[in-house]
Regions:
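Compositionally biased, charge-rich terminal segments
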Residues: 1-4
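Primarily NTPase-proximal linker/entry elements flanking Walker-type ATP/GTP-binding cores
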Residues: 6-126, 133-178
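Non-catalytic, surface-exposed connector residues within folded enzymatic/regulatory domains
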Residues: 23, 44, 59, 63, ...
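Short beta-strand segments
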Residues: 96-97, 179, 215, 269
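Short glycine/serine/threonine-rich phosphate/pyrophosphate-binding segments
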Residues: 101-108, 131-133, 223-225, 248-252
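Conserved catalytic-core segment of NTP-binding enzymes
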Residues: 156-171, 185-290
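Short glycine-rich anion-binding loops that position phosphate/pyrophosphate groups of nucleotides
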Residues: 181-183
């Protein structure tokens, strides 16, 4: 079953039985959106906006109502540029997120994509706490054909990033992709660690383009938002990488993220292959689910 086919089937069933935009239709739509992981507030708000739109614009046909819903959901996701800004040399992208969400794998896939675009990419193994994290990243560096800077397990992450930035400047690298520890659930520790990395970037690459991407597992649904709020408060996020979207029917989490965090989804993981982390396109996403 393809990308969002389950969710598409649910919404298609709803619209295939459509006769008019009456109260029964709106109640069923709200329930469908909640089940799709938009969250209660987002689902209720979307349905209320659709009610108003149907009334004001006299929408009657199934397709007119469906397109009205698409427009509402699209508007929810207009929270920032979905493209990465990596124009300076080097640019730096920090990846954050808890263990098990596919952070290291996402870095490898993005590295491979940038390499195909002709960029010279370096990976920085600053997750020095998780056993074999650097080994895993090194495997991805080999697959993607990228350089990697790493140290011993338990090394200071800031020192690893410093070494990577020095090497990147010396070797004319375009983009540094930096893995970080996923175990820092304590907000104070997380803030201190990220602030330290940020200061090193400020000092070694002043004025460079910088991205801070939070990697989230889509299958965790609304629970993922709890993680995301903590990281948003501490990290100054520029975007989200949403993994394992192919493993869930609950694609509404994309809209919930945009609504609650005001941060765009920049990449969506739709499979295990090296090319299966795709730049996120909001229009294609909405048309895929509605």
């Amino acid at each position: 079953m393809g990308f969002f086919d389950k969710l598409k089937k649910i919404t298609s069933n709803l619209f295939s039985g459509f006769t008019e935009a009456d109260e029964d239709f709106f109640e069923e739509l709200e329930e469908t959106l909640i089940m799709a992981d938009l969250g209660v507030d987002a689902a209720t708000d979307a349905v209320e906006k659709l009610r108003t739109k149907v009334r004001k614009e006299h929408l009657q046909s199934q397709e007119a109502v469906r397109e009205g819903l698409r427009e509402i959901l699209m508007a929810e996701m207009e929270v920032g540029d979905t493209a990465m800004k990596l124009d300076t040399k080097p640019s730096v992208c920090i990846f954050i997120g808890v263990n098990g969400v596919g952070k290291t794998t996402s870095i490898g896939k993005i590295a491979a994509s940038l390499k195909k675009q002709g960029k010279r990419v370096m990976l920085c193994a600053a997750d020095t706490f998780r056993a074999a994290a650097s080994d895993q990243l090194e495997i991805w560096a080999e697959r993607a054909g990228c350089e990697i800077v790493r140290q011993y397990e338990g090394a200071d992450p800031g020192a690893v990033l410093f070494d990577a930035l020095q090497a990147a400047k010396a070797r004319n690298v375009d983009v540094v992709l930096c893995d970080t520890a996923g175990r820092l659930h304590n907000k104070a520790n997380l803030m201190a660690e990220l602030a330290k990395l940020s200061k090193i970037i400020d000092r070694e690459c002043p004025g460079c383009d910088r991205e801070t991407l939070l990697v989230l597992d889509a299958t965790t649904g609304q629970n993922g938002l709890i993680q995301a709020r903590t990281f948003k408060e501490t990290a100054g996020l520029t975007g989200i990488v949403l993994t394992k979207l192919d493993g869930t029917a609950k694609g509404g989490i994309v809209i919930a993220i945009a609504r609650e965090l005001g941060v765009p989804v920049k990449f969506a993981g739709v499979g295990e292959g090296i090319d299966d982390l795709k730049p996120f396109d909001a229009r294609s996403y909405v048309e895929a689910i509605i």
